[in-house]
């Protein structure tokens, strides 16, 4: 194969990245500051509340949203994290994950809705999503560093790129799965597109969209250690430094903390009691 | 009321629907009388509805009837432009809806025309009340007023007290009443009903038809009812349109349709029995309940009691027909400990499987027990009951077995076992 | 053949099965006659089978009958120790199987006893042939020989030519024949059949029963047949065991069971109609087919033809009964363009809904058309047909509507509509 | 929480790891050499065949196992990888992934069978699997390095730990899903446990087990870049070095190569035509 003139794909990409950094420099900095402020806002906000109180709040939240079992798990889990001394890094990881997930929802759901309404949009978006999910997450670090240099912001950006696809995919799926005869009924009674979307399509799609968000949370969590490579603080960087300094003990401890956060978030989002089906009286 | 007094509610002028590309060219070909096949070959598009022309009078129940694929649901969906007509005009109360803007059309759908669907199309995530008020909700009517109106329609269809239930908690019949109530809440002039009762089980369907007639007497809406069931059309239609392959074949009152069927197709359609197939005993025989001769009188009695019959044929192990056991004899035998053999009655008439119905007509009518149908080795194949004979002759294919032998046709018949 | 000549195939001595903990203590309590409730309270374990004692003769069809939960499938599964008995002994051909080792037991299952299951239990990933030869395959019989044997059994059950198909390609009846063939290929002495025909539809079940009887005549296996259907037990059982709540209530031939039911329970069981409930016209009336008086004679004729009836009641819009239309009159009216009103026949008998069957018996028997059942406002509720009256009196609950009114009970009745 | 005497969980783990390295040193070295030989054997073996020929072989294999579409994708994909100059690293990655997956099957399926037969085993194994899958993969690098120091072997070991759970889980699921009445039938006809397993349970479970293997392949592939951190060669290390040297172009190119390998392997294993249901005549 070497006979063929090799198109310098690598250089083209590099020059393209440099060009973007030049032209949109200011724009990216703006985003960077906004994002950093948002994440740190969460961290300091949560930081004010003493760990015990915060643990109880989390457990109560878990109880209200889902089941008693999960509330108990949350309580013990977070107590353990605090006990092992990983409370602050945990808060930073939580802030990083929540921010990435919130962005995935705010950006992802509308794209999903748009794709569900326009067939051509859907046909373009789906292969991109496939690519985004199979491409190793590391690769996303590169553009993140160039546009947002080191710190929590590139971590968030890389996490968002990696974690957003399921939210988009499930939003499209949820809306598409609404039976055709219901859509016809909305037409026959004279609904506008907005009325059809908000009164029928979205309510029926909620369950599937929530499943998508659950997947996004798990993906964001799986990125925390990789994000640490670009300076994102939290449990991820604890693991990363433990690996680089070959301190197995610390690595396992921080790993367990991540596992606790992961299982808690996963169980809560999976058991969100969807209010829709409350049985009316006879 | 003679025809011309009643005002015209809906006017349909030369409306056609072509599915596929090159619809313009196809409409042209339709106009100069090309057949559907030619159009399909030339343009690759199929003709859904071919130049439909009719008027619907105000307050009438107008039934559009045809087999599946006849274009009836396409035609009804063009009336509220759920499906855009390819050619022709549609007028409602004189206003032409075919060139209305999106917004004007939405107003017509909200105020003038409501629709009831075959599979109910109720919103599973909304209670019965929220379903019923949906139409008014879209029009921005405030909550208090629209819920009050919705309750009224629910009362009208007999669903008071169910408003807070969810659709999946109700039976098919009740769900369709909600569909009806939802359509009535907008207080439209016209009700489009697309095979509204076809998904219900036969018994409920007849009740719903009666209810629709009562409702129509009270509220006096113009109803366009789509169905593939001749009985349903005859029972509720003031006038009936017959459709076949996208064409309107005949329009008239139920009597007119039956009186002079406009062409051979209509005749066959209402005739619905292909008299050319001559029926034999095998076609109408039912499964024979028999008792083995080696059983006792009490077993015979219990079998007869369970089947609600007063006589039963006795057979040996090879299912060879031996005679008849009457309930009265069996009772006596049970008391005086006789065996079935002692009370076997050997006068009975049998007919071979392929005798024509006409031949066995008199045998069946004067025999007081069902006639036994036997094969060449005198083995029991089935029995012929008087009701089945009359029903079959009257063309009711409920009584006719498909391939002329009773049900075990698809399993290799028992005879094969050595 | 008197009883004592035939050799005993299976002997069951005081066999019990207790589910739960403390089974030892429970067996003790059973021995000294404690009731099931006392045992449950004391040990928290339930008594599945309570000291069963019986013998099965060689070559006999021995039916074990009982409602669901009577312990019949537990009992049959103890015969091949699929379920381990808690107490008592079981002998097959005199060898005690209750204390056999795992390997000895496996030999008995491979050679002596085969089983046929209610839901067929065919291996979906194996062809019919591979399913049938499974038993021999386990015993290491070489491919050529076992396939030849399997083909033989498939021929025996009439499934020649289907050997390369997969189970999900066959109907229920044919799948059960494969189950039968698979059990026969091992050439066992004993066939355990656990409700083998209950999953089949009624028509096929009767054929399979006949086939089993033929098969039994040819191959002469000892068959233990489990069922909950009295008719099935009467038709195929040489002897029947009746079980209730884990106890054997009676053992005897079908005649003996019917002749002197051993206790009140057995009597009720075979009686199966609770005569205490006195039937009224409402209980047995069927849905009334009616024609509205404003329709024409041809519509009436078509409705009658489709329903295979020769007369139909005419009602007004409020479903008030006006009279009877006979098919012959309607034919004349159609020819000479008369309306239904002209040919309305006003002699007809009506009965209110709550008249007792005994009272309307003579009215029904001498009227030549079905009797109309009406409510206080003379509105049609249903019709009483002679067949239904006889069937109901004979205790066949097929003809009896659940709550004494015909089917629309669960929908709020139409009357509510204003 | 600081008042409580902090149990030095980290130190305990470290001392435990050291103890294992001491006592089982020899044993681990044995495995290391065996594994290294196996992986390098694949690489040199495949290396002999010229890339064009190997691409055709892969495409033919894809066609035979699954569908024409996938064979075409394999052909073009591997040609592109060769064209971009990543052929050798691809071979190494393929060897790493195949080795890890083979180990997952050879070790995982028997554990799955064992767990499906013994309820207690299943109750112990399932929570461990959950933990293994939620723990960040990085943590597995630590024990891998200690026991097998640097190179492809720790990469394989870490990949196996991360990739094996789905194979075990799906083996248990597949066997458990065999309907109870079929199991009763095997008993009634006198099958030994082995006969029941190989004649009925495993054949019916194949489809589910294959789905488990497919998931393991995807997880192994997602580990290639992390494995590179402990010296495993291949596309993973291309991406890793690109990230550390901030060369976005190379990073994206290597990333695309990984995506191609991932999609090819995924589609092939998903479409393996299970021979079971070949329709007989008559």
From Swiss-Prot, chains A, D:
Residues 90-269 form the ABC transmembrane type-1 domain. GO terms for molecular function: amine transmembrane transporter activity; carnitine transmembrane transporter activity. Disulfide bonds: none annotated. CDD domains: TM_PBP2. Residues 40-44, 91-93, 159-215, 264-282 are cytoplasmic. Pfam families: BPD_transp_1 (PF00528). It is a multi-pass membrane protein. GO terms for biological process: amino acid transport; carnitine transmembrane transport; choline transport; glycine betaine transport. Its main location: membrane. SUPFAM superfamilies: MetI-like (SSF161098). The chain crosses the membrane at residues 19-39, 45-65, 70-90, 94-114, 138-158, 216-236, 243-263. The complex is composed of two ATP-binding proteins (OpuAA), two transmembrane proteins (OpuAB) and a solute-binding protein (OpuAC). Belongs to the binding-protein-dependent transport system permease family. CysTW subfamily. Involved in a multicomponent binding-protein-dependent transport system for glycine betaine; probably responsible for the translocation of the substrate across the membrane. This is Glycine betaine transport system permease protein OpuAB. It comes from Bacillus subtilis (strain 168).
From Swiss-Prot, chains B, C:
The keyword Nucleotide-binding applies. SUPFAM superfamilies: CBS-domain pair (SSF54631), P-loop containing nucleoside triphosphate hydrolases (SSF52540). It catalyses: a quaternary ammonium(out) + ATP + H2O = a quaternary ammonium(in) + ADP + phosphate + H(+). One of its GO terms (biological process) is amino acid transport. It is an enzyme of class 7 (translocase). GO terms for cellular component: membrane. Its EC number is 7.6.2.9. Residues 34-270 form the ABC transporter domain. ATP binds at residues 66-73. Pfam families: ABC_tran, CBS. The keyword ATP-binding applies. Residues 284-340, 344-403 form the CBS domain. One of its GO terms (molecular function) is ATP binding. Keywords: Amino-acid transport, ATP-binding, CBS domain, Nucleotide-binding, Repeat, Translocase, Transport. PROSITE patterns: ABC_TRANSPORTER_1, ABC_TRANSPORTER_2, CBS. The complex is composed of two ATP-binding proteins (OpuAA), two transmembrane proteins (OpuAB) and a solute-binding protein (OpuAC). Involved in a multicomponent binding-protein-dependent transport system for glycine betaine. Probably responsible for energy coupling to the transport system. NCBIfam families: proV (TIGR01186). PANTHER family: GLYCINE BETAINE/PROLINE BETAINE TRANSPORT SYSTEM ATP-BINDING PROTEIN PROV (PTHR43869), GLYCINE BETAINE_PROLINE BETAINE TRANSPORT SYSTEM ATP-BINDING PROTEIN PROV (PTHR43869:SF1). Belongs to the ABC transporter superfamily. This is Glycine betaine transport ATP-binding protein OpuAA. It comes from Bacillus subtilis (strain 168). The gene is opuAA.
């Amino acid at each position: 194969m070497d006979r063929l003139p090799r198109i310098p794909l690598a250089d083209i990409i590099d020059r393209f990245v440099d060009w973007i950094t030049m032209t949109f420099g200011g724009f990216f900095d703006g985003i960077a500051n906004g994002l950093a402020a948002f994440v740190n806002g969460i961290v300091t906000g949560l930081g004010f509340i003493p760990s015990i109180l915060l643990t109880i709040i989390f457990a109560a939240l878990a109880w209200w949203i889902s089941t008693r079992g999960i509330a108990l798990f949350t309580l013990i889990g977070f107590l353990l994290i605090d006990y092992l001394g990983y409370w602050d890094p945990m808060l930073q990881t939580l802030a990083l994950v929540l921010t990435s997930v919130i962005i995935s929802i705010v950006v992802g759901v509308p794209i999903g809705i748009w794709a569900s309404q326009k067939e051509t949009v859907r046909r373009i978006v789906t292969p991109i999503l496939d690519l985004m999910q199979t491409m190793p997450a590391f690769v996303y670090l590169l553009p993140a560093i160039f546009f947002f240099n080191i710190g929590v912001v590139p971590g968030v950006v890389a996490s968002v790129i990696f974690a957003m696809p399921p939210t988009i995919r499930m939003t499209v799926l949820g809306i598409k799965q609404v039976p055709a005869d219901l859509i016809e009924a909305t037409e026959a009674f004279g609904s506008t597109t907005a009325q059809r979307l908000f009164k029928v399509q979205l309510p029926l799609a909620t369950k599937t969209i929530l499943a998508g968000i659950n997947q996004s949370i798990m993906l964001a969590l799986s990125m925390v250690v990789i994000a640490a490579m670009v300076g994102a603080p939290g449990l991820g960087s604890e693991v990363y430094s433990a690996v680089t300094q070959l301190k197995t003990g610390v690595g396992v401890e921080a790993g367990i903390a991540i596992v606790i956060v992961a299982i808690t978030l996963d169980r809560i989002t999976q058991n969100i009691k969807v209010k829709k089906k409350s049985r009316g009286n006879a | 009321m003679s025809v011309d007094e009643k005002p015209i509610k809906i006017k349909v002028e030369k409306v056609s629907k072509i599915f596929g590309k090159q619809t313009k060219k196809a409409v042209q070909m339709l106009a100069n009388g090309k057949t559907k096949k030619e159009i399909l070959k030339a343009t690759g598009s199929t003709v859904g509805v071919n130049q439909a022309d009719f008027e619907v009078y105000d307050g009438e129940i107008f039934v559009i009837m045809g087999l599946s694929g006849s274009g009836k649901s396409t035609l009804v969906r063009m009336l509220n432009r759920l499906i855009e007509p390819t050619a022709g005009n549609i007028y409602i109360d004189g206003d032409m809806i075919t060139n209305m803007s999106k917004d004007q059309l939405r107003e017509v759908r909200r105020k003038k025309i409501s629709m009831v669907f075959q599979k109910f199309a109720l919103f599973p995530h909304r209670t019965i009340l929220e379903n019923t008020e949906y139409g008014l909700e879209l029009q921005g009517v405030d909550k208090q007023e629209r819920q009050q109106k919705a309750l009224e329609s629910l009362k009208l269809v007999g669903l008071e007290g169910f408003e807070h239930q969810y659709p999946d908690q109700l039976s098919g019949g009740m769900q369709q009443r909600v569909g009806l109530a939802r359509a009535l809440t907008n207080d439209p002039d016209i009700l489009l009903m697309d095979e509204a009762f076809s998904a219900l089980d036969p018994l409920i369907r007849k009740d719903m038809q009666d209810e629709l007639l009562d409702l129509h007497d009270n509220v006096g809406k113009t109803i366009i009812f789509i169905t593939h069931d001749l009985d349903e059309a005859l029972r509720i239609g003031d006038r009936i349109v017959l459709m076949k392959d996208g064409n309107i074949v005949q329009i008239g009152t139920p009597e007119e349709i039956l009186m002079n069927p406009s062409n051979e197709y209509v005749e066959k359609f209402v005739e619905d029995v292909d008299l050319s197939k001559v029926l034999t005993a095998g076609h109408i025989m039912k499964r024979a309940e028999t008792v083995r001769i080696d059983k006792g009188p009490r077993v015979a009695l219990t079998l007869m009691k369970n089947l609600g019959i007063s006589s039963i044929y006795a057979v040996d192990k090879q299912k060879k027909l031996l005679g008849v056991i009457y309930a009265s004899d069996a009772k006596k035998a049970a008391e005086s400990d006789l065996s079935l053999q002692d009370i076997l009655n050997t006068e009975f008439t049998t007919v071979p499987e392929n005798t024509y119905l006409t031949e066995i007509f008199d045998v069946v009518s004067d025999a007081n027990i069902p006639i036994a149908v036997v094969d060449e080795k005198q083995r029991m194949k089935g029995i012929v009951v008087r009701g089945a004979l009359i029903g079959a002759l009257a063309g009711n294919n409920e009584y006719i077995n498909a391939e002329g032998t009773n049900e075990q046709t698809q399993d290799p018949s028992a005879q094969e076992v050595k």
